[in-house]
Amino acid sequence: MTTTNSHEFWDDRTVMVTGGSGFLGKHLVEDLESRSDDVEIFVPRSNEYDLRKKADIKRAFEDSSADTVIHLAATVGGIGANRENPGRYFYDNAVMGIQLIEQARQYGVEKFTILGTICAYPKHTPVPFKEQNLFGGYPEETNAPYGIAKKALLTQSKAYRKQWNFNSIYLLPVNLYGPRDDFDLETSHVIPAIIRKCIEARERGNDAITAWGTGEPTREFLYVKDAAEGILDATERYNASDPVNLGSGEEISIRKLINIIADQTGFEGDIEWDTSKPDGQPRRKLDTTRAKERFDWEASTAFREGLQATIEWYEDNRDDIHGDE
């Protein structure tokens, strides 16, 4: 990880972190607090500020006097949730992002960091995904509403820089994983879902677990603490319109991923593949050259190391997470 002293940038800033109480947000806030003793952090909680409503966004800026915004908040989920909620995922993410950027411009915000999504890439993007190919086709159908809503914010970012010199940057992370992830099987992504399934099957003595699709697609995963670091490093050091990928550089098939999780959780049963369920995009792997070149960032956590930390966190906290369900 980078070791540059970050105090000069963050000192005396007031940073609004939307989604700051979520999975990525909690890690980012902790990292940010460690970078400066003189930074003020404002997290607009969803029960107090509905960021889809202009009035609530205005109130958030009035209450915080933020000069820097890191926009992490999103309505998001796994393949199943995307299939069930395409309209909601499009509307929530588009409206929230577009209005936040516009109000930030009006309030004179000095720096705005937008978090995009790998789902914005075209379905058949050449691998590894390069930022210049982002608008080269239609996204994978399951994730298209979410991906297109997020990609619209890149167009807005570039337009606002051109017309008003508004300083916003746009980052594209791969799927994240790590401690505090979402382990609800209705909404979770593949890593937390399979960790939970394997541990519960092991404890019950089940002979098999079921996984979606064929297991053939490949994915890239980024440890959440690395992602938080990359976002903050970019906010400090990067000031340009070009989008930037954030990834680990490791590509793994879903089949191999699930076998690794089974091994690390101690589940010795079979993996049954439900091929009636979608695979999603065939391959995902990012070219992360630009992040290294533009703001000297690269991921540092080995996949199995991050996976073990995630499994241990879940086993230590699962009773608090699931309660009496």
Which ranges hold each PLM region?
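Glycine/proline-rich active-site loop of Rossmann-fold NAD(P)-dependent oxidoreductases
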Residues: 125, 176-193, 203-207, 216, ...
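N-terminal Rossmann NAD(P)H-binding glycine-rich loop of SDR-like oxidoreductase domains
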Residues: 7, 13-33
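Amphipathic terminal alpha-helices
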Residues: 1-14, 35, 39, 304-325
